[in-house]
Amino acid sequence: MKAQTTSKDSLILRQEVVGARRPSNYFWAVIVSIGGLGFLLAGLSSYLKVNLLLVSDTSALQFIPQGVALLFYGTAGTLLAIYLWLSLLWNVGGGYNEFNKETGKVKIFRWGYPGKNRRIDLDWPLEDAQAVRAEVREGLNPKRELFLRIKQRRDIPLTRVGDPMSLSELENQGAELARFLEIPLEGL
């Protein structure tokens, strides 16, 4: 999440939030695509008794049970790859957090899956912001997130989902946001 202050007299703070378009997601989409397509072609080769792969000859495999298993895993892998590529295309989870002192609004925007809730656009008055809360949990599944506490609402997550940010980055962004909004920073 990159924070950049824009507009005259630093009255607008806009933080971009990276969604599904992270390098690790591109890597996994390519790997799963290659693996799923390879298994699918190997299963089809054993059924059709024609070699469809460039790297090995799987047409000699028995269709039952090896070919069926390859076909099943290939279909599952290909469907997972399609899901990953569509998530990347739609940039699910991407968006921005905008804190605007000119209009007195907090705006949280995220992209979702196509349908009724494709655009997730939340607005609150700036004076309803009570605090910036940092949540840090270490261990096997570490969690480092920033939340905005809003009056009479649940805490709103501000950071990206996925790989946790460094503790210093979390502190800096939390302190910058708390300073900009002139509210306390909790949890550190």
Swiss-Prot record:
Transmembrane helix recorded as keyword: yes
CC terms in the record's Gene Ontology section: photosystem I; plasma membrane-derived thylakoid membrane
Localization: Cellular thylakoid membrane
Pfam families: Ycf4
Broad class of the protein's primary localization: membrane
The keyword Amino-acid biosynthesis is annotated on this UniProt entry: no
Function of the protein: Seems to be required for the assembly of the photosystem I complex.
Family: Belongs to the Ycf4 family.
Protein name: Photosystem I assembly protein Ycf4
Biological source species: Microcystis aeruginosa (strain NIES-843 / IAM M-2473)
